[in-house]
Amino acid sequence: MELPWTALFLSTVLLGLSCQGSDWESDRNFISAAGPLTNDLVLNLNYPPGKQGSDVVSGNTDHLLCQQPLPSFLSQYFSSLRASQVTHYKVLLSWAQLLPTGSSKNPDQEAVQCYRQLLQSLKDAQLEPMVVLCHQTPPTSSAIQREGAFADLFADYATLAFQSFGDLVEIWFTFSDLEKVIMDLPHKDLKASALQTLSNAHRRAFEIYHRKFSSQGGKLSVVLKAEDIPELLPDPALAALVQGSVDFLSLDLSYECQSVATLPQKLSELQNLEPKVKVFIYTLKLEDCPATGTSPSSLLISLLEAINKDQIQTVGFDVNAFLSCTSNSEESPSCSLTDSLALQTEQQQETAVPSSPGSAYQRVWAAFANQSREERDAFLQDVFPEGFLWGISTGAFNVEGGWAEGGRGPSIWDHYGNLNAAEGQATAKVASDSYHKPASDVALLRGIRAQVYKFSISWSGLFPLGQKSTPNRQGVAYYNKLIDRLLDSHIEPMATLFHWDLPQALQEQGGWQNESVVEAFLDYAAFCFSTFGDRVKLWVTFHEPWVMSYAGYGTGQHAPAISDPGMASFKVAHLILKAHARTWHLYDLHHRLQQQGRVGIVLNSDLAEPLDRKSPQDLAAAERFLHFMLGWFAHPIFVDGDYPTTSAQIQHINQQCGHPLAQLPEFTEAEKRLLKGSADFLGLSHYTSRLISKAGRQTCTSSYDNIGGFSQHVDPEWPQTASPWIRVVPWGIRRLLRFASMEYTKGKLPIFLAGNGMPVGEEADLFDDSVRVNYFNWYINEVLKAVKEDLVDVRSYIVRSLIDGYEGPLGFSQRFGLYHVNFNDSSRPRTPRKSAYLFTSIIEKNGFSAKKVKRNPLPVRADFTSRARVTDSLPSEVPSKAKISVEKFSKQPRFERDLFYDGRFRDDFLWGVSSSPYQIEGGWNADGKGPSIWDNFTHTPGNGVKDNATGDVACDSYHQLDADLNILRTLKVKSYRFSISWSRIFPTGRNSTINKQGVDYYNRLIDSLVDNNIFPMVTLFHWDLPQALQDIGGWENPSLIELFDSYADYCFKTFGDRVKFWMTFNEPWCHVVLGYSSGIFPPSVQEPGWLPYKVSHIVIKAHARVYHTYDEKYRSEQKGVISLSLNTHWAEPKDPGLQRDVEAADRMLQFTMGWFAHPIFKNGDYPDVMKWTVGNRSELQHLASSRLPTFTEEEKNYVRGTADVFCHNTYTSVFVQHSTPRLNPPSYDDDMELKLIEMNSSTGVMHQDVPWGTRRLLNWIKEEYGNIPIYITENGQGLENPTLDDTERIFYHKTYINEALKAYKLDGVDLRGYSAWTLMDDFEWLLGYTMRFGLYYVDFNHVSRPRTARASARYYPDLIANNGMPLAREDEFLYGEFPKGFIWSAASASYQVEGAWRADGKGLSIWDTFSHTPLRIGNDDNGDVACDSYHKIAEDVVALQNLGVSHYRFSIAWSRILPDGTTKFINEAGLSYYVRFIDALLAAGITPQVTIYHWDLPQALQDVGGWENETIVQRFKEYADVLFQRLGDRVKFWITLNEPFVIAAQGYGTGVSAPGISFRPGTAPYIAGHNLIKAHAEAWHLYNDVYRARQGGTISITISSDWGEPRDPTNREHVEAARSYVQFMGGWFAHPIFKNGDYPEVMKTRIRDRSLGAGLNKSRLPEFTESEKSRIKGTFDFFGFNHNTTVLAYNLDYPAAFSSFDADRGVASIADSSWPVSGSFWLKVTPFGFRRILNWLKEEYNNPPIYVTENGVSRRGEPELNDTDRIYYLRSYINEALKAVHDKVDLRGYTVWSIMDNFEWATGFAERFGVHFVNRSDPSLPRIPRASAKFYATIVRCNGFPDPAQGPHPCLQQPEDAAPTASPVQSEVPFLGLMLGIAEAQTALYVLFALLLLGACSLAFLTYNTGRRSKQGNAQPSQHQLSPISSF
């Protein structure tokens, strides 16, 4: 049944047939049409006898592109057609061939002339051409992407065709296959939209033809499928409303010979069309016509008679089905009517086997039984049909892992693993961990160039219990991400609903033996169709159900391990079949119309052949085997709805045994009807073959073979594999395909070959799977034979498997993957095997052709319209004006300098990677390559290269082009910058010796890059001079200018038609200085005073010479650009305020980059500072002239302007300081007169990580040389022997590229591209292989040099896909208000602010003791006075009023109330302070939030053990009781403990906090924590039981936690580490209180395991009794939560002997270097983590009411009132809290930490958290509001962030009494690089951060106006307004 979307086309285009359709001349001869020409037809007609596959008229492969000269036999062929009464011939034009550019302005004239010649040949043979404008594939063009563009382009193309061929053509068709054209349109998923597009295009062509070309007297139509017409008979009234758009109706007609209706009757039915219309049968397909049936001639005669007799308005039809064309060496090709009717399918004709036996199996056996081995194994050199799909498969349980992730339920395979049933006790719990790696797996597919990916969906991953319920969101998200990634990479998803992994919950109800599972499966399938069907168009209901039935329920080898072959296996299969049929009908009825997909089933089968080829019994047994294996499922679906008749064997054996040995269920008649035809395709998987004999002595055992009555064997000559059941029998797949086609699909349905492969064993070579390479070659070639020679309609070939996985009972011992997976590494790295490259090659060739199939990829284009233009001929000033870069940025605060910027680069930005020949190619002496200076150098002893390494092999890229291309595709790079080895193509350096093999290598590389849509950027010289040229002096010899030009000229001529970006030299500074000054690089010359200048002089002139050669000889034709790559570090003045350092920094830049750039980009001469300095020093050295050579005026003019773009390589930055070096001996280094100082010291890295230097360097280049196009051609970080998790490199690229983005977006630098150094690990010069720069790890110890992706290789493609670093949707700013009644608060703590440490009877606390202990507190600070809040109640209340908060959270000093910690004595003076303070708060309308304990334990209690002494629980309860009694009438918000984690872990673990205990880190923290929890619970119960009723307050605890993100989200261990981090920090105390009264399981498990592992007899973590658990559980009224930052967590295994909290947690943490820093080393600004951890609290603890009781950020250094960093922090974090509210988190309040600067524990007063500055230089300690205080006050007044689009909000107006804050320190503050007065800075601050506007007189007014301009629809603004020099 054709898809119903054709209704739209019919109704919108063809209902109103034009009146011209009825004017067809009555005397016009009847049309009998043949054609068109196809590649197969031409091949068959041109083949000598014996080479033809069959007599083919219109083959099944690509239509023939017109190429001159036309085949010589065409004239004879056309004449024979005319002699056979053929009158017309179909010709298919190629749109893409005629208009290669897409525009009729530039047609391919050769193609036009070719088609005219073809049409004229037809006319000469008296055949009338019938021309189709668009047969299948429209040309790929970016223009088609635009809405409405297709119709315009098609009209343009049609006009050209009418003009060019109209004099030769009278009959035109716009489209002949609508469905295939739609599939090739950009928006094919929207079928209705695509059909409307074609309708518009057709109408345009029709109108143009009849308006402009009516004089030609022709007709125009479009081809439709005939079976749609009866269902779509139009209403006459509707027809009148539609204008005509065809002259006659053209149909694609299929007819079944065995149909009840005759063909004439079928034609007569078409006459019911209204209005009456002439009908032409464009294609006549005769199906299911047996060779012994009606003769073709009689059928043809009956057709003609019916037409004449019944006056059927049929003007003609296709006669291909009645023609037979032959050719031999002696006669010309000829065609005639045939007497043996061909069986024509939708795409091809299949020749029936003559005189074949009755059954399909016997006919197949007869066709191949007598083949000789030579004939059977002959290799077919041919290609698959166009559109053939190449794919790869996996199964969910094989690869996903993630067994306990995000709510996923267990499957039967999880249960199977728990039984330790698999080899090596392997389980599927982690498998290949694909659950965490969807992007990585898709990248692998992209690398192979797969077109389809067959994967399965985990049923229990979506529905944990199998039944319809709330789906698992994380599971849905995983598959959405996978599918979206596939489509982004142009890979078609083929989703399997069931691949053996039934939810265990359903298995416990009987599994597939329980009828209810069918309903459950239907619900699951319906959800998948609804959720994913908008993108998935190929569905598989069941994958290999035979395996599930046989091995799962028959032999019990597979899960669920049930052994019942006679009963269970048949019952399971029965229910699977019913589930499949109902699922297909579900899709057909409810989803097909909208989604336009296809649903099938994948069945597996071996091929069976008789053991005794002459035995009829064995032949019958073999046929029975096939029906038992394949027919068991295929026959009901594809034949008649019931099991095959061979199932009678079951009845037979039951009768023989006298009891039911097996029971085959029966289908009802309704079920049979449901089953029959319930598939859109047959999926087939096949691995091996079997020899079958009749069963020997039958027994009454219920084995599979015994029930089937056969016995299985293998030929011992068949090669073995690692699997005992797979033998290599390639020809079996061809025979099986032919059988399946004849028995089941019969040409009506396509076959998708959905599984084929073989495993290698663990003991085999990990990467060289040559045996599998052979397997694929043989098997795929047999599939090709089935398609080409047997004409089986196979649409795909899908390899098993993409990666190694869990193979059920065999565990991980058998490896099917094209990619090897290292299961011993937690990150499960994937490395390509040899077979991956082979499969790619087959895909690229679409089979086994000598040439790759041209895919016409969209070319990556770089914009070269704006090239560098030198307009200023003046030399640079000294120092240059580019020093503005220093002035512009030197005063930036660190926070502003490093703040991450969100944005994208220009659309055509070139993202690439770089390499160089000596470093990667190897093949140092291969195929005639000559030696280079690096070959000579590395083979010379004592060369200084680490480990005596050489580049002889390196990465072996010379021999592994496929491997390099694989990883380039995987990375999605748009460009590849590589270098040509001079000595590889000119072994002696001269063009008299050209090495063809070397040239061929680069041609293959360049061609492959272009074919893969990767832009080649080619460097001519990357330090590897041919040794033969060095022998004549190398670059000291001026003759190299001419020789280099000769080499370059050859490269331009040979490669320039494809290479459009050239660089002459890479980093000439390195080659010159390291090769001729220090001499550490070849040619190892040490003459530092003269030779660097002499050599550079020649290099510059050589560059200029080559530039002019390209410019004069090649540019006009090749249209490329040419430049050179320069390098330098950024030079930052050590003291930007010291002019000498500024000049020294500029001098360094001029002596490095300017040395070469100044002559080329400036004035043709060296920088004046170089000439001045070297000249003066030469004179001081008593030399007659400067050591720096001079250019003549002619040379200056020749050199000046010899670069089109600016390419530079950069890695790091250095501090530069002026220095006066020695004069002698003369040296280039000393000439610079400076000293370099490293910015920081890092170990294990090649370069210091100084990303901000990139932005400054780019700005310097812009200022120095003008704003010319710039390409960063190298940038990367080298690491010493890094792991695959190279997080440091990710941070490096992330921050460096972000600085480049700032330069582009904020500073206007014309940056066009970025190339990462380097693609893969390589030979790193003197460091050999010890320093690794590669995005890919290369194993240099393995002969094949396998490449494995590092984490950075996963990060970089995402950068490319996003074209930069756009703001993530979740990070977009959210405008809105918090809920009414939301609490805004500020916080402090007693010891941190009160002071008065011995006043009025206060007792000592542990912090008094700790701070008076030497070396405990930074700067020897203490809290004796602190902020003196004890004496400043009024001042503190005023500070709170400044903020406008409704609440204030403070703590009570235990020792101020109870000096010795007990109730023996209550200090009334201390209590009075709190009463007075609380009263003052209440009087000011501020509600107190009181923390009972904030770390300051009375020292008297610590003296008896503190929190390690269990008696403290009662002491704390008594202390709390005093507070409840005395203050409870005023205080309604109580917090028992603040951050117990810090108390326990830092006070009793690390000892960095009071009481400073660190010598029992494995026990003390847990004991203290245990008592803290019990103390909290007792205090809560006290309040709940005694005080709550009369006081009406609430009480809970404040728990602190960072958020933990996995360092590598794709690494399962890192994911688990992040969870452990949060559970050990926040869950330690939250889990007992808010969950179940006990510690988190991960804590209990890890601490117990480590305790026992250390020899202890129990866990170091104390246990709660059951009564304690009950008493602790639920002791909360709300969740008090403190949060400041986020970490990146990863697993770290400590030795068992280590006993500590950190060792137990087993987690290490780092920070992303792009995260803004604060004044605290541990606190990085990470707003996103705030929302995530709030959501975690919601999910983990059932969404309790949450109050954020602390959140803030610190600063260090000189105090400033303009705390822009804190405003950024508060704005970002509070906005994330607002988002959490929108996530339904029950957030009730927010508290800023802190109200004022205070004593910050061990750091003293160095870290300032306060929104009020406390001026400690003033004895009165005034509280001065910072800008952040006023910002926070605005948020409080507004209760959030008013939407500017809603107009000005009153809350944004400053209160009238708000006075500007005067600074106690300075009158001006720096703001974004400017010095502003406090008032101006404050205004600018509010403008920038609070309201995102530039310049403000009225804050609210401008907010309103900017909001109106920027708001688009309902979208939230996603980017701040940015200062040109700010990253804010």
UniProtKB/Swiss-Prot annotation:
Distribution of this protein across tissues and organs: Intestine.
Matching Gene3D superfamilies: Glycosidases (3.20.20.80)
Reactions catalysed, as given in the entry: lactose + H2O = beta-D-galactose + D-glucose; phlorizin + H2O = phloretin + beta-D-glucose; D-cellobiose + H2O = beta-D-glucose + D-glucose; quercetin 4'-O-beta-D-glucoside + H2O = quercetin + beta-D-glucose
Keywords for this protein: Cell membrane, Glycoprotein, Glycosidase, Hydrolase, Membrane, Multifunctional enzyme, Signal, Transmembrane, Transmembrane helix, Zymogen
Signal peptide (residue range): 1-21
GO biological process: cellobiose catabolic process; glycosylceramide catabolic process; lactose catabolic process; quercetin catabolic process; response to estrogen; response to ethanol; response to hormone; response to hypoxia
Propeptide part(s) removed at maturation, as residue ranges: 22-867
Transmembrane regions listed in the UniProt entry: 1884-1902
Post-translational modification: N-glycosylated.
Subunit: Homodimer.
Family: Belongs to the glycosyl hydrolase 1 family.
Function: Broad specificity glycosidase of the intestinal brush border membrane that hydrolyzes lactose, the main sugar in mammalian milk, to produce D-glucose and D-galactose. The mature protein is composed of two domains that catalyze the hydrolysis of beta-glucopyranosides and beta-galactopyranosides, with a preference for hydrophilic aglycones (in lactose and cellobiose) for one domain and hydrophobic aglycones (in phlorizin and glycosylceramides) for the other.
Protein name: Lactase/phlorizin hydrolase
Species whose genome carries this gene: Rattus norvegicus
